[in-house]
Amino acid sequence: MAEMNLTLVTEFLLIAFTEYPEWALPLFLLFLFMYLITVLGNLEMIILILMDHQLHAPMYFLLSHLAFMDVCYSSITVPQMLAVLLEHGAALSYTRCAAQFFLFTFFGSIDCYLLALMAYDRYLAVCQPLLYVTILTQQARLSLVAGAYVAGLISALVRTVSAFTLSFCGTSEIDFIFCDLPPLLKLTCGESYTQEVLIIMFAIFVIPASMVVILVSYLFIIVAIMGIPAGSQAKTFSTCTSHLTAVSLFFGTLIFMYLRGNSDQSSEKNRVVSVLYTEVIPMLNPLIYSLRNKEVKEALRKILNRAKLS
């Protein structure tokens, strides 16, 4: 019977928020507005970094890639979410669901690795300032980012193959805003031990491994800051606050979503958290890095002054 059901599954039906039809239009307009702010804010960050020579430092090189990933990350999920709200549900073919799942994992994994690299960048800037420029040369930066992209590709391939070799039976309805692992696991049946082990290995390799790099980097940073005069401690640590804020928001939602047991999974909670990491956090990142960064604010001021003069 499971095999028959498996052969009949040719599409999935996304039904998130369909139980609240009166909220469909307000949520559609809200999420559309947030998506536009996300795209414009992150593209503005990328343009600022490309145009201002003061922002050609390693940290901003990594930040430009993070901004690009945030645009891609949101663009994979938000248009689908808007379609679900507008049409009160949306059908997604098996292949399209797998493709969305792969791209979401790809961009999300790269986000994790980039945040880890940015923590390493802050470690070098604070703990090894004399060697900072010589270690993070242009070639080194390109190699690190290329490594993040390759690791993201491998992670996405492993996770997607593991998830979509599972047997799906029963209902094909997904009470979620896009094709993601927690709701898909609720549709599985039959033997899935090997795939679940691979999925767990992915979660350990991407999320906790990135967090270990971040935590170790900041441990060394804190130790280094404790060794400098009290008057300079706040100024030195302020260079890390933007990154720490972004890390706390991003990894906090990922841990809640992916590192809990299946018994703790709630459709409503998962939907709220998914909106946080697909819409809210990518929208806030440009604000976090610009409002708390003097160099970015100065670059923005220069461009605005040029626009006024022209």
UniProtKB/Swiss-Prot annotation:
Membrane topology (Extracellular): 1-25, 76-99, 161-197, 258-270
CDD domains (alphabetical): 7tmA_OR5-like (cd15230)
Cytoplasmic side: 47-54, 121-139, 218-236, 292-310
Subcellular location: Cell membrane
Disulfide bonds: 97-189
Membrane topology: Multi-pass membrane protein
A GO term for molecular function: olfactory receptor activity
Glycan-linked positions: 5
Keywords: Cell membrane, Disulfide bond, G-protein coupled receptor, Glycoprotein, Membrane, Olfaction, Receptor, Sensory transduction, Transducer, Transmembrane, Transmembrane helix
TM region(s), chain numbering: 26-46, 55-75, 100-120, 140-160, 198-217, 237-257, 271-291
InterPro entries, per the entry: GPCR_Rhodpsn, GPCR_Rhodpsn_7TM, Olfact_rcpt
GO BP annotations, alphabetical order: G protein-coupled receptor signaling pathway; sensory perception of smell
Pfam families (UniProt xref): 7tm_4
A Gene Ontology term for the protein's cellular component: plasma membrane
Family classification: Belongs to the G-protein coupled receptor 1 family.
Function: Odorant receptor.
Name by which UniProt lists this protein: Olfactory receptor 9Q1
Species for this entry: Homo sapiens (Human)
Gene that specifies this protein: OR9Q1
